[in-house]
Amino acid sequence: FFFFFLFFFLFALLPITRRKKYYFIQAYEVNFFDNIIWKLIAGLTYYLPLKKILNSPNLLPHKHDDFIGVVPAGVDLNVFYPKPSNRLLNGHTSIGIIGRKEKHKGTSEIISVLCSLENKAGIIINIAIYLEEVDKQRLIAAGFQVNFFPITSDLELASFYRSNDIMIAVGLIEDGAFHYPCAESMACGCLVISNYAPLTETNSVLKLVKFDACKLGEAINLCLNLDLEEKSKEIQSNISVLNKYDWKIVGETFNSLLLDANK
């Protein structure tokens, strides 16, 4: 982090006019640190003489609302595309999670909710990228079949999404912000439970206002009880939302914003 922030501050001080210095912000970094010094350093970056572009409109506190535009992060829809159908595999329902080491990602909290489900019959848990051994053992002790997938490419990640009937893409901070696992799993034709965009921008019955263990448990049970027509309607609604996040469209939006800013 030290070298990242050092480079960042040096860049801000380069003898280039402010109109040509931009800061594309995908997260409010202050939330990611417990150490007060790192929080302070991260917070100072938002006061640098840079033109701020956000990937979600409500990403920063109001004191930093001097951004010049909002450009959502893009999704490669040639890679993240829907599976042929939302059929159950051998009578089982697969639930997927992108596991992360960072505590604010909420992986352990999600696993706690899964372990507390009353009806665990026929559920397979698929976890990609990161899984602590203690959490794996908790899932096994609860009676789940658990599969772990180390992901090394976007193609593998997209395949992972498509292998699941349900994706849980929730976190503990920045409710409503753009979230790659949420967007990518929506594009891949999964039922998605999330407190992040793009799902929170829809009328989905599976969107959450914030992380809440009880609400998450209710959403999982709702997924498990949807009929085929309800599943299809939810999935098609998710897929239709993703068109505006296609890389081509996002790239054109970003380019137009930069051209206007330099006039």
Question: What residue ranges belong to the model's regions?
Answer:
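Membrane-proximal helix-turn-helix segments that form the acceptor-binding/catalytic region
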Residues: 31-53
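Acidic anion/phosphate-binding donor-loop and adjacent secondary structure
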Residues: 33-36, 69-92
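Conserved donor-binding/catalytic core segment of Leloir-type glycosyltransferases
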Residues: 86-105, 111-116
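Nucleotide-activated donor-binding/catalytic signature segment of Leloir-type glycosyltransferases, i.e.
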Residues: 135-155
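Acidic donor-binding loop of glycosyltransferase active sites
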Residues: 162-177, 190
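Short hydrophobic beta-strand element within catalytic cores of glycosyltransferases
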Residues: 187-194
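A charged, aromatic-enriched C-terminal amphipathic alpha-helix characteristic of glycosyltransferases
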Residues: 228-262
